Amino acid sequence: MKIKIISDSTCDLSAQMIAENDITLTPLTVVKNDEQFKDGVTITPAEIFAHVAAGGDLCTTAANSIGEYADVFEKYCADYDGVVVITLGSGFSACYQNACLAAEDYPNVRVVDSQNLTTGQGMVVLKA
């Protein structure tokens, strides 16, 4: 059985771990000075840290939308027997809720609430 593992960018796994385990990341939106970026795509953690270290305001994040999740599911559902999505904990973000709503249209998608963030979430992803 061919299974695809998907997580959001907050799982903090290294590029090597992601590649070795064929994990797909969905980047959260990072808001810096009212400007939106995609985590790990159009802004790096180093850029965020440098911004804050220079006295800038803390950045915030926004969950992936239902539509963004649906786009990712559409991309992988045809080629995989199952898709497992492990999200940032539902107590921290709307990622889990949005992924569940998007998954209603994809019977081979299962959404898992990691109940964690950063490396805790990453460990759940690696165990999958």
Segments predicted by a language model, with ranges:
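Class I S-adenosyl-L-methionine
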Residues: 19, 74, 100-104
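Conserved beta-strand scaffold positions in the cores of enzyme catalytic domains, especially
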Residues: 25, 60, 85, 109-111
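N-terminal glycine-rich anion-binding loop in soluble enzyme alpha/beta folds
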Residues: 4-65
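N-terminal glycine-rich phosphate/adenylate-binding segment common to multiple enzyme folds
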Residues: 68-96
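Short beta-strand segments
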Residues: 7, 87-89, 112-113
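Active-site histidine-anchored catalytic micro-motif
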Residues: 79, 93-128
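Short active-site oxyanion
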Residues: 1-5, 81
